[in-house]
Amino acid sequence: MGFSAHEIRELFLSFFEKKGHTRVKSAPLVPENDPTLLFVNAGMVPFKNVFLGLEKRPYKRATSCQKCLRVSGKHNDLEQVGYTSRHHTFFEMLGNFSFGDYFKKEAIEYAWEFVTEVLKLPKERLYVSVYKDDEEAYRIWNEHIGIPSERIWRLGEEDNFWQMGDTGPCGPSSEIYVDRGEEYEGEERYLEIWNLVFMQYNRDENGVLTPLPHPNIDTGMGLERIASVLQGKNSNFEIDIIYPLIEFGEEVSGKKYGEKFETDVALRVIADHLRAITFAISDGVIPSNEGRGYVIRRILRRAMRFGYQLGITEPFLYKGIDLVVDIMKEPYPELELSRDFVKGIVKGEEERFIRTLRSGMEYIQEVIEKALSEGRKTLTGKEVFTAYDTYGFPVDLIQEIAKEKGLEIDLEGFQCELEEQRERARKSFKIETKEVKPVYAHLKELGITSRFVGYEHLEYETEVLGIIVGDEIVSEIKEGEEGEIILRETPFYPEGGGQIGDSGIIETDKGIFKVEDTQRPTEGIIVHIGKLLKGKISVKDIVHARVDKERRWDIMRNHTATHLLHAALRNLLGEHVRQAGSLVADKYLRFDFTHFSPLTEEEIKRIEELVNEKIRENLPVSVMEMAYQEALQTGAIAIFEEKYGERVRVISCGEFSKELCGGTHVSATGDIGYFKIISESSVGAGVRRIVAQTGRWAVNTAFEEHTTLKKVSNALGVKEDEVVQKVEELKEEIKEKEKEIQKLRQEILKLQIREKVKEERHRELTLYYGVFEDVEPEELRNLADILRQRTGKDVVFIASKKEGKINFVIASSKGISKEVRANELIRQVGKVLKGGGGGREDLAQGGGKAPDKFDESVKLLKELLSGVSVG
C-alpha cells in the first residue's frame, strides 16, 4: 500500500525536526483572537501573529500537522464536498515554517529532499511552478536542484503569489506537482502536492511592495492528497484513514461505493462530514444557530440529508464517531477524551433533525403546491432558502424535487438570502473576538515584556517598563489620569483561562496607582489598568506592586472549587461531561458543561455534597509542570478551546481532580471553606450552566436564604420545614379559583353572544359575526367552537378589540370545512384588518392593527361566501 497516512505524518515531522525545526502540536480548530476566521483553515494560521511581528516564539523554525476546516469565506469547500475526489471540509495540513531564519534556497532544498529521498517519488515525475517574475526561485530549481526548464512552469499572480490580505505580508510561491501518467487528464494528471510560500514583501495601502527585513517561509502539504499519491489511490476518499468511513456508510445504508455517482457522492459526504463534526465538537464547537456552531450544525445536517437520500431514516452518524476516534486518536489523543461527549451531542442533533427532515419534505411539497396553484413556474429565493436554512435541504435536492413538478428555482434570489445570512453569522462571531491594538505591538517592537511572578508572590518590588495613556505610549502618568502600566515582573494575575484579572495597588514614594484590572492583550505583555490616585509614576521608577490579597484569595477559592465541581460532575453524571466555558470571579464562579438534560434537585444536592466532602477532606492541591503530551498521558483533563504551550501546569486535588490550568489556586481544598450551588440552567443545546459560591460569599448567601425562609414562614404562619407544603397548597387554591373565574367568564361571554353576535343566512349557510372587548384568543376559539355547532352548516367570524389591535377567529362546521376553508378566508379577511392569520381548514385565527375595519372585513367575508355552495 505504500506509506500509511500516520507514517507520512510522522516522517514529515521527524524530517523537519532533524533540520532544526521545533515540532508544534496542532492548534484547536477555533482560532485564537482572530476576528477574520471562523475556523483554522491553513497550517500558518496559528503562526499568523508571529508572521505579523505581534508575537515572539522561542524558536525560529517550526513544523506542524495542523487540523483545518474549510467551510466559509474564500476557502469554502462545503458545497463541493462529495462531488469531487479532492475536496474536504476537514483535512490535515503538513507544514514547515521559518520566522526570519532560512529562506528560498533551504526551503526548496528541504522540500526536494523530503519528496525524493524520504517519500521516494521519482524525480522524473516531478514538476514545479514559480511566480513569473521570481527569477531567484527559478534559478534555484533549475541550476541548483537540476530540474530542466521544460518541467518548470512560470505562472501568474493568481496561481503563484500569496498574500495574507489586501495589505500586509505577501510574496511569491512555488508549487511541486507529481505527474500521475497519461491515463489522467488536467489537474488529475498533474497533481499539486506542496506549496512553498516565500513571504518577502509588505504591501501597503497603495499596493506598493517593500522588502521585509526578515523574510519568512510558510509551506503547506495536504496529508490526504499526498497519501492518495503514495497509496496509489484515485481519490483522497480511498486512503487508509478515510475509506473505512466509506465502508461504514455502505454498512448503514446497504449501498455499494462505485456503482452509482449519486451514491458515491452521498457516501463521500458522510465520510468527510463525520471527520469534520468529530474534530470540531471535540474542540468545543457545539452545534447551534449562530457563528461556528451554526456551521457545524449545517455540516452535520448535510451528512444526514445525504444519508436520507440513501434511505437512512434513523440517527446513524453518532455510530460512526467511534470509528473516527479509533482511526485518529494516536496523533490526536484529545479525541479519546471527548469520545462519549461527541457521540451524545451528535445523537441528540440527529434525533431533533430527523423530525425536521420529515417536516421539511412537507414544507417543500406545500410551497410547490402553492406555486402551482398561483400559476408560477419558479420557487422564490426565500422559499428555497427556508427549505435550505430551516429544514437543511441541499439546493440541488430542492431543485430536483421542484423539477419533478415542472418547476425551476430562483437561484439568484436564494444567493441574496444566503449572503444576508452569512453576513449575520460573520457579525455574530466577530463580536466575540478582539484584535491586538497597535500600541501593544509597538511595545513588543521596543522589546518590552513582562514576567508573571504571582504564583509565589502577592507583593513585589519591580521596575516600570512602559505606560499607556489614551492609546499612546507616554513617559509618566499624572494624578487623576486613567491608564495602563507595564512592569518588568508582576504579581498581578492577568485575565485568562476563565479567571478574572487581579486588582490592587502599584506605588512609589511619589505616587499611588489603583489597579482595577489586569490583562494580557498579547503574548508577553501584561497591563495593569487603573487610575493614578496621587502624585505621579514614571517609566524606570522602582515600584511596590501589591495585589488585593483578600480578593485574590476569593478568586483562588473559586478556581480550585471549579476543578472540584468539574470532577464531581464527571464522577456523578458520566465521562461525557466536559468543560464548555467558565468564569472564575471573586464573588462567584460560573461553570458551563456538556450534558443533555437539566439536573434534578437530587443531582444538584449530590454534586454539592460531593464537592463539600472533598473540601472537608482537605486534599493537598499540587502543581506540576510537564510536557503537554505527558500531561494528557497522566490522565489530566485539557479544556476545550484553551490554547496550551508545549509545557503545561497540571493542578491536582489529591487523587480526585487533575487538570491543565494556568490559574491561581489554594494550597489545600480545606481553604475553600464551603461550596454552595446558586443556580443551574441551560445555555444552549447540550450545554448546562452552574453558578456557585465559596467561602464567605457562600456563607453570606446561605445566611440570607435562611433569613428569607424565616420571614416567609412567619408570614404564612407555619414552621420553616412546612413552608413548601403550605406554598403548594396555596398554589392549588389559586389554580381552583382561576378555574372558577374562567368558568364564570365563559358563562358571561355566552350571555353576551345574544348582544354582540349577529346571525345571517347566506344560501345554505348561517353566518355568525360580532366584536367583543378584551377577550383572550383562547376564549374567542371556545366561543367560535360553540357557535359552529348550531346547525351543522355554520360559519363564525368573531373578534376582540384590545389596545388599538384586533384578534379574530374564523371557524366553520366540520362537515363543510372542505367547501368553507377557514385558513384561506382568514388570509384574505386579515388583509382588510391590516394583519393576517392561519390555521386549519375548520378553524383559523389571526391578528391585525385596524380594529375600525371590522365592518369592512365582514362585508368582504359575505362576498366570499356568496360564491360558496355546500349542497
From Swiss-Prot:
Task: Please provide the Gene Ontology terms (biological process) for this protein.
Answer: alanyl-tRNA aminoacylation
Q: Name one GO molecular function term.
A: alanine-tRNA ligase activity
- What InterPro entries is this protein classified in? aa-tRNA-synth_II/BPL/LPL, Ala-tRNA-lgiase_IIc, Ala-tRNA-ligase_IIc_anticod-bd, Ala-tRNA-synth_IIc_core, Ala-tRNA-synth_IIc_N, Ala-tRNA_ligase, Ala_tRNA_ligase_euk/bac, DHHA1_dom
Q: What is its EC number?
A: 6.1.1.7
Q: Which UniProt keywords are listed?
A: Aminoacyl-tRNA synthetase, ATP-binding, Cytoplasm, Ligase, Metal-binding, Nucleotide-binding, Protein biosynthesis, RNA-binding, tRNA-binding, Zinc
- Gene Ontology terms: cellular component: cytosol
Recorded hits in CDD domains, A to Z, give: AlaRS_core
The record's comment about this protein's domains reads: Consists of three domains; the N-terminal catalytic domain, the editing domain and the C-terminal C-Ala domain. The editing domain removes incorrectly charged amino acids, while the C-Ala domain, along with tRNA(Ala), serves as a bridge to cooperatively bring together the editing and aminoacylation centers thus stimulating deacylation of misacylated tRNAs.
PANTHER family per UniProt: ALANINE--TRNA LIGASE, CYTOPLASMIC (PTHR11777:SF9), ALANYL-TRNA SYNTHETASE (PTHR11777)
Details of cofactor binding: Binds 1 zinc ion per subunit.
Q: Which organism is it from?
A: Aquifex pyrophilus
Q: Which cofactors go with this protein?
A: Zn(2+)
Provide the protein name. Alanine--tRNA ligase
Q: Which domain of life is it from?
A: Bacteria
Q: What is its main location?
A: cytoplasm
Localization annotation: Cytoplasm
Q: Which family does it belong to?
A: Belongs to the class-II aminoacyl-tRNA synthetase family.
Role:
Catalyzes the attachment of alanine to tRNA(Ala) in a two-step reaction: alanine is first activated by ATP to form Ala-AMP and then transferred to the acceptor end of tRNA(Ala). Also edits incorrectly charged Ser-tRNA(Ala) and Gly-tRNA(Ala) via its editing domain.
